[in-house]
Swiss-Prot record:
Gene Ontology molecular function, alphabetical: RNA binding
NCBIfam families noted in UniProt: arCOG00985, PRK14560.1-4, unchar_dom_2
Name the record gives this protein: Uncharacterized protein MJ1432
CDD domains: eIF2D_N_like, PUA_MJ1432-like
Stored InterPro entries: CHP03684 (IPR022430), DUF1947 (IPR015266), MCT-1/Tma20 (IPR016437), PUA (IPR002478), PUA-like_sf (IPR015947), Uncharacterised_CHP00451 (IPR004521)
Pfam families on file: DUF1947 (PF09183), PUA (PF01472)
Length: 162
């Protein structure tokens, strides 16, 4: 992944990012410390937000979306979708999440929400995506795409070196 542009963010821009991350995390000041160096790295596909050279989020369609590396450190307790073990091999190759593979989902999820997909055994994040149906539908549907996969273990964002 080639970086086209990279720059440090102003305090005002950092505040905006913190506000967007507060939707998912209560510990935003730990995620982005006052003395942390916050940068944006612009690639052909994404704008990656770095704190002390560690990718914590990326921007897609004007949404700030947490990276899996951040989720491994601090997993929110909302917007979670649990998938069965059989789905993992497809998700880590970039496949969208299909409804039959979903074991459980936060019923407060609405269509177009950012969601975090975890495995049923270890509850470790596997991918981050956008909900294509609400949480209740995800649990009940037996066919169709439920989540558009945006970022998964082993992709360009996962392998990004700050």
């Amino acid at each position: 992944m080639e970086i086209r542009k990279r720059y440090f963010l102003s305090k005002k821009d950092v505040k905006k990012i913190k506000k967007e991350l507060e939707v998912f995390f209560e510990n935003v000041d730990e995620i982005i410390p006052k003395k942390g160096n916050v940068e944006i790295a612009i690639t052909d596909d994404f704008e990656i937000i770095l704190v002390d050279k560690e990718p914590i989020a990326f921007k897609k369609d004007d949404k700030v979306i947490p990276t899996l590396k951040l989720l491994l450190k601090s997993l929110p307790d909302k917007n979670l979708v649990v998938v069965d073990i059989g789905a993992i091999k497809f998700l880590i190759n970039g496949a969208d999440v299909m409804a039959p593979g979903i074991v459980d989902a936060d019923e407060n999820i609405k269509e177009e929400d950012v969601v975090f997909v975890v495995d049923e055994n270890h509850k470790k994040p596997i991918c981050v995506g956008i909900a294509l149906m609400n949480g209740k539908e995800m649990k009940e549907a037996d066919k169709g795409k439920a989540i558009k996969n945006l970022h998964y273990v082993g992709d360009k964002i996962w392998n990004f070196k700050g």
